[in-house]
UniProtKB/Swiss-Prot annotation:
The keyword Zinc applies. Its EC number is 6.3.1.13. Zn(2+) binds at residues 60, 248, 273. This is L-cysteine:1D-myo-inositol 2-amino-2-deoxy-alpha-D-glucopyranoside ligase. A motif ('HIGH' region) lies at residues 62-72.
């Protein structure tokens, strides 16, 4: 892996004010877990993840105006598993996550609620941190707000302009800066979508294909020129604020550098967000791939639809916690399905998770239980095979059923299983 980019060295000061959340204790297991294999969205296949001594991962964070729904939780729990499995196999982990704390949806919600956008963002970010701590998610090493990375964004945009990969639209009032979608020959490799699909998703997911003055409807916003009533920062190309995709490229390059092991997020980020953030980085570094693996979690639904802020069909982690739901059951409920699958949350899913948690706690509390060596090995193996949580949970169910039905003579088995469940699945029994 190369060193972090010199994007961090600009004439604009960089403020490191954002903090993450307290890390849960992670017990160590004997030996080392097997090599992790994950589905790569770009290659459309499961293949080994082969980091160096330090594994690197960038996961896109929230836009803090309605945190934290179970769709968010499913994504961050997915990459928490990756983090834990890397640690179990002997790697140090450099995990970076951003917060998109300057964006149109945030401004719109703040205006609707009669609150300042910074106040809203700070409040929802703090709630997100509380939810992540309650869910026992391992925190990122670098937790970076977009507003803390303006200097890096400005320098990255300058490099793209100098390389001819970006241009300023001919608009005296709003001279926005755009990225040329054809700036890299490999553009489109991550999603594999055809142009019509790209255009449809671009319009649906925050793009502006009809913006006058663009060279191509797919060209993506890098720098939005200052608008009345909106925050802005100075730059060589005029006051304004960052586009969405360039924030992640700049933060990842400045904190980790090239050779990123995993870029991750929800499957709705494959295009345009991840496709463009990768292209932004690739066009200035010359790298063929921004990340060795592109990993995406499926969507969580409720009442027959994908859970989303725009639809308003949200099940919030904070509300479940206020209702007295054990956060360990939330983890188990989301782990009951495979991370790549779109799936639905329901009262039945929660009830099953609570019952499973009770069985596991009862089994691990027994004075004697069946030997745990095989079940721990199988859980490690299943999780290393593209995070197969359904098989891992089924293996633990089998051990717990045997323990509760037949007992056993191993006085340490319960502790062994509880330690493995804590270390690998993040669930305290």
């Amino acid at each position: 892996m190369n060193q972090p980019s010199d994007l961090s060295h600009t004439s604009m000061s960089r403020v490191e004010a954002m903090h993450s959340w307290s890390a849960p204790n992670v017990p160590a297991l004997p030996g080392r877990g097997p090599q992790l294999r994950l589905y790569d969205s770009a290659d459309r296949q499961v293949r080994p993840v082969a980091p160096g001594a330090t594994a690197t991962m960038y996961v896109c964070g929230i836009t803090p105006y309605d945190a934290t729904h179970l769709g968010h939780a499913a994504t961050y729990l997915t990459f928490d598993l990756v983090h834990r499995l890397w640690r179990d196999s002997g790697h140090d982990v450099h995990y970076v996550q951003n917060i998109t704390d300057v964006d149109d949806p945030l401004f719109e919600r703040a205006q609707r609620d009669g609150i300042g956008w910074r106040e809203l963002g700070d409040r929802e970010t703090e709630l997100f941190r509380e939810d992540m701590a309650a869910l026992r998610v391992l925190p990122p090493r670098d937790y970076v707000a977009a507003t803390e990375a303006i200097a890096e964004v400005v320098e990255l945009v300058e490099k793209m302009l100098a390389a001819g990969a970006a241009y300023v639209v001919d608009d005296p009032q709003y001279p926005d800066v755009y990225f040329r979608a054809d700036a890299t020959v490999q553009f489109g490799y991550e999603s594999g979508y055809d142009r019509d699909t790209m255009l449809a998703l671009f319009a649906e997911r925050g793009g502006d294909p009809d913006r006058p003055g663009k060279s191509d409807p797919l060209d993506a916003l890098l720098w939005l020129a200052e608008r009345p009533g909106e925050p802005s920062w100075p730059s060589p190309f005029g006051p304004g604020r960052p586009g969405w995709h360039v924030e992640c490229a700049a933060i990842a390059l400045s904190r980790i550098g090239t050779g990123l092991d995993i870029q991750g997020g929800g499957s709705d980020l494959i295009f345009p967000h991840h496709e463009f953030s990768a292209a932004h980085a690739e066009c200035v570094t010359g790298e063929r791939r921004f990340a060795r693996h592109y990993v995406h979690a499926g969507m969580i639904g409720w009442d027959g639809h994908k859970m989303s802020k725009s639809r308003g069909n949200l099940v919030l982690v904070s509300q479940l916690r206020r209702d007295g739901v054990d956060p360990a059951a939330i983890r188990l409920g989301l782990f009951a399905g495979h991370y790549r699958d779109d799936r639905f949350w329901s009262p039945a899913v929660l009830d099953e998770a609570l019952a499973r948690l009770h069985r596991w706690r009862s089994a691990t509390a027994l004075a004697g239980a069946p030997d745990a060596t095989d079940v721990v090995a199988r859980v490690r193996r299943y999780l290393a095979d593209d995070l197969d949580t359904p098989k891992a949970l089924a293996a633990l169910d089998g051990w717990a059923t045997d323990a509760l039905t037949y007992g056993g003579h191993d006085a340490t088995a319960g502790t062994t299983v509880a330690t493995a469940v804590d270390a690998l699945l993040g669930i305290a029994l």
